[in-house]
């Protein structure tokens, strides 16, 4: 059933607190549609949506779905973790679309700039948007995080440009037809869905082939995996390393320097002067949960939060912290929540080596999300593996145990505390700041 968005007046979102789907909810609210939703969790995004005036029910089930809506939008996670609900949803006499399908609808007919890759998608997407807004290109944006200045993952623009973060999970990004495709990097991830790296490369290759001859693919052509993926591309290939140099950025880390090069490369392809792009990238403030400063404890300990949940991201983030807090001057304690049993199991040895720049690591229980524990991997096993790599690490059974452990720790002005992971580790830092 085709959908004309202009005729849609009332929309119900299932899993509305998801960082991607919530952006579409904000977009529809901005357009004057009536937006309702539900979510099983009650995090920061849900709070922000309620503040914006969206009525959100707690929980999930077919009995919560209104009968008088014109469209139902759902998070693709329910297809796997709640198949009975998904089946019942499909039987409703109301059009339903997944979040990835909605990305196709909202970007249709636009000059779409899609940012893909295993790491750096959010920062690069936000950087491109920051540059284009500074030079009055007035883009619409959907970002996989809350922007610092707007406190939103959606920005409404009035131009042809639509910048969107393109996630590879379950081949979601194949719903998008980009004119400019940015590939930050390609590594093994989402191994609960993909069979292996080859399967991931096949998905990226399919995305590459969607970019037209007069389009652009921005990537690192010297990366062997990426080079294989773009081999048959019809579009113009732009090596973002040609735009790389050490810039003055407000956010530390070599990975952010690389993301900045990719953002500038993309901006230049649509007519932005490179010198102006360089000037504006220096004012980029970052995004929510990416090297985010949360505050200081009464003892003088600095508290940060970061979304890193893949070994490569953990390494890059800790290297960034060591740029500003060198060894011998500060001790870094990381409170890490592994994200997904499948990812932790498949990348266990890489995770074990990723915390080499930390002094202490506290491993929280694994964030299950859409998965079931099969007993083959645990926080305790990861902590043991980290210890074998000469970093002090211990696992805890609960968030409360972690909080009590931290409250008993003699933190001082020479300490830095970093909560890390894609789940809810950030709440530990927030609670500590309230207690101190």
Provide a role label for each language-model segment.
Residues 3-4, 27-30, 50, 64-67, ...:
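Phosphate-binding loop of NTP-binding sites
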Residues 67-71, 160, 412-415:
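Short acidic/histidine-rich motifs immediately flanking catalytic phosphotransfer sites
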Residues 2-10, 20, 27-31, 244-360:
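Nucleotide phosphate-binding/pyrophosphate-handling subdomain across enzymes
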Residues 1-98, 102, 252:
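N-terminal leader/targeting and accessory segments in enzymes
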Residues 402-434:
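A glycine-rich beta-strand to alpha-helix segment
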Residues 302, 352-413:
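C-terminal helical cap/extension that packs against the catalytic core
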Residues 33-40, 217-221, 333-336, 358-368:
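Short internal beta-strands
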């Amino acid at each position: 059933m085709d959908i004309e968005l202009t005729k849609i007046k009332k929309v119900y979102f299932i899993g509305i607190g998801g960082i991607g789907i919530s952006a579409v909810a904000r977009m529809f609210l901005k357009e004057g549609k009536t937006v309702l939703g539900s979510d099983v969790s009650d995090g920061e995004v849900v709070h922000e949506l309620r503040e914006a005036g969206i009525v959100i029910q707690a929980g999930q089930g077919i009995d919560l779905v209104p009968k008088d809506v014109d469209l139902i939008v759902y998070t693709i996670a329910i297809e796997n973790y709640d198949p009975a609900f998904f089946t019942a949803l499909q039987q409703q006499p109301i059009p339903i679309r997944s979040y990835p399908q909605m990305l196709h609808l909202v970007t249709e007919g636009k000059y779409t700039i899609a940012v893909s890759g295993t790491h750096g998608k959010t920062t690069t997407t936000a950087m491109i948007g920051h540059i284009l807004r500074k030079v009055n290109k007035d883009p619409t944006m959907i970002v996989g995080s809350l922007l610092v200045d707007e406190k939103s993952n959606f920005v409404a623009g009035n131009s042809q440009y639509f910048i969107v973060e393109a996630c590879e999970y379950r081949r979601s990004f194949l719903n998008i037809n980009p004119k400019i495709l940015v590939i930050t990097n390609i590594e093994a991830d989402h191994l609960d869905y993909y069979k292996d790296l080859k399967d991931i490369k096949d998905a990226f290759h399919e995305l590459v082939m969607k970019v037209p001859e007069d389009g652009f693919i921005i990537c690192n052509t010297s990366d062997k995996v990426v080079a294989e993926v773009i081999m048959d591309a019809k579009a113009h290939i732009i090596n973002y390393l040609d735009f790389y140099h050490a810039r003055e950025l407000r956010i530390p880390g070599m990975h952010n320097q690389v993301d900045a090069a990719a953002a500038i490369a993309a901006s230049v392809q649509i007519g932005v002067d490179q010198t102006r792009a360089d000037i504006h990238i220096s004012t980029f403030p970052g995004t929510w949960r990416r090297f985010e400063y949360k505050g200081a404890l009464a003892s003088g300990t600095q508290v940060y939060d970061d979304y890193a949940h893949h070994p490569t991201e953990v390494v890059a983030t800790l290297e960034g912290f060591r740029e500003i807090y060198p060894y011998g001057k500060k001790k870094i304690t990381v409170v890490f929540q592994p994200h997904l049993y499948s990812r932790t199991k498949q990348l266990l040895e890489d995770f074990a080596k990723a915390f080499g720049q930390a002094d202490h690591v506290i491993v929280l229980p694994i964030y299950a999300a859409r998965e079931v524990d099969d007993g083959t991997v645990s926080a305790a096993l990861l902590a043991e593996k980290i210890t074998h790599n000469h970093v002090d690490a211990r696992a805890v059974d609960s968030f409360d145990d972690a909080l009590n452990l931290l409250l008993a720790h003699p933190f001082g002005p020479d300490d830095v505390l970093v909560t890390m992971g894609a789940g809810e580790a950030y709440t530990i830092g927030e609670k500590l700041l309230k207690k101190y």
